[in-house]
Regions:
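Core beta-strand elements of the Rossmann-like FAD/NAD(P) dinucleotide-binding domain
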Residues: 1-4
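N-terminal Rossmann-like FAD-binding beta1-loop-alpha1 element of flavoenzymes
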Residues: 6-30
Length: 129
């Protein structure tokens, strides 16, 4: 019988992020109902949005998200996710994610995509989502 300190159910980005953190404190097992890459995170397309540019703000990102959500978003949840976004990007960088480098002295290429009024989408080639 296999044993672990932490059992993570799901191999998407949320589950694997937790597994990486939990691994600092004990043995981790990750299980999924299908193939390892047969999860929504692996099938997602596009990039990851975060306030990364000094010309952007949390308030602008929150407003864009609430507007695009057509009244269906929980404002406090949106605020929390947006405000924690830059920290999540820094953590991904520490884990070795190579976001596309920027031009003209920028650290990373930032794109403007649907629903966003500012450039805040980071890509890692075509693998992010």
């Amino acid at each position: 019988m296999k044993t672990s300190d932490f059992l993570v159910i799901g191999a998407g980005v949320a589950g694997l992020s937790f597994a990486l953190r939990a691994a600092e404190h004990g043995k981790v097992a990750v299980i999924t109902k299908g193939k390892f890459l047969d999860c929504s995170s692996a099938k997602a397309q596009g990039g990851i949005a975060a306030v990364w540019d000094r010309n952007d703000s949390f308030e602008d990102h929150i407003a864009d998200t609430l507007d695009a959500g057509a009244g269906l978003c929980n404002e406090q949840a949106v605020r929390t996710i947006v405000e924690e976004g830059p920290g999540a990007i820094r953590e991904l960088l520490e884990w070795g994610v190579n976001f596309d480098p920027g031009n003209q002295g920028e650290d990373y290429e930032l794109a403007r995509e649907g629903g966003h009024t500012k450039r805040r989408i980071l890509h890692a080639k075509d693998a992010t989502g």
